[in-house]
């Protein structure tokens, strides 16, 4: 009887230890909160699409129904020291030049603007060495496009 209680007690301690380690691992591996859209495009612009820059931030595509323009901004999850960032936007059909912003920034790159009423757009951005691009999206509506992580 004592032996079975000792084994049961050891098993309970082992399970408790594993549960504690699992909790500690989960807590320490918590991801950084995703960057929220910061309103950098100005009043009247609403987020119509976004794509994460893995572990670093988010690129937001916004649109103003009043002006008919798209706007893109790349936002870091955790602002801090200056790091290389860029953001870009162009018409998928090649009817416009690329508009972009790049440099060493503490929190976001952009905004960049392009008339977008009824056209598909290519857009994306980067934070440090992690980049993402979306091709052929939105086309005058809320549509996902093709996402490429680099």
What do these predicted ranges mean?
Residues 1-29:
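Secretory targeting and sorting signals
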């Amino acid at each position: 009887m004592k032996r079975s209680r000792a084994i049961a007690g050891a098993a309970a301690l082992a399970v408790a230890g594993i549960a504690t380690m699992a909790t500690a691992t989960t807590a320490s591996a918590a991801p950084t909160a995703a960057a929220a859209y910061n309103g950098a495009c100005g009043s009247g612009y609403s987020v119509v699409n976004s794509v994460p820059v893995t572990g670093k931030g988010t690129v937001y595509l916004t649109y103003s129904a009043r002006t008919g323009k798209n706007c893109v901004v790349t936002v870091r999850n955790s602002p801090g020291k200056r790091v290389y960032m860029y953001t870009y936007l162009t018409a998928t059909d090649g009817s416009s030049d690329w508009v972009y912003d790049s440099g060493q920034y503490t929190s976001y790159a952009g905004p960049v603007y392009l008339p977008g009423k009824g056209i598909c757009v290519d857009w994306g951005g980067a934070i440090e060495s992690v980049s993402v691009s979306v091709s052929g999206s939105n086309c005058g509506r809320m549509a996902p496009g093709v996402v490429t992580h680099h």
